[in-house]
Amino acid sequence: MCIRDSIYLAGGFQPILNEEEPIVPTDVLVFDPATFTWQQETVLPPFKDGANRTLTGGCAVTFQTDKILFMGGVNYDCFLAAIARPIHLAKAEAARDSAAITRLEAEAKAYMHHPVEWYRFNTTLLQYDLSTKAWSDLGEYEQLARAGAGAVIQDGRLTIINGELKPGIRTPQVNQAKL
């Protein structure tokens, strides 16, 4: 997303690399084209229970002249456990830890078969104010619990387009909300 001649990035992930644990980001980065550098703009606010939040798989739109609305995306804990499972399984196999191997193989086999609610995709509409560097929680909306959705603001309405309800299952739904 480009605002005020800067590019903002939230989400993504780093897969297992050279036997290192994967990384799921919990921050927003800003790229300054004048200096060709990335810097941390802000850390995402944690959930009310203190759990980490990520915008991996989420989407964002500019709002007014100096705000960004962030929505959707995967649950940090569920996603990190899934993408880290191969390295944990390899370590369990190297240690000949049969209990861990059995558990991790069962988790991998079951991962795509859980009900939608199990994945806990993000339902919070977050607003980040670039002027004050402050986050606002604009509420919980089940329609935002998507990964890979598109979003657009037009005529004072936020439109959320499609997205995954859970891994591998996309919805054709288009939802709108008046801002």
Language-model region placement:
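Kelch-like beta-propeller repeat domains
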Residues: 1-179
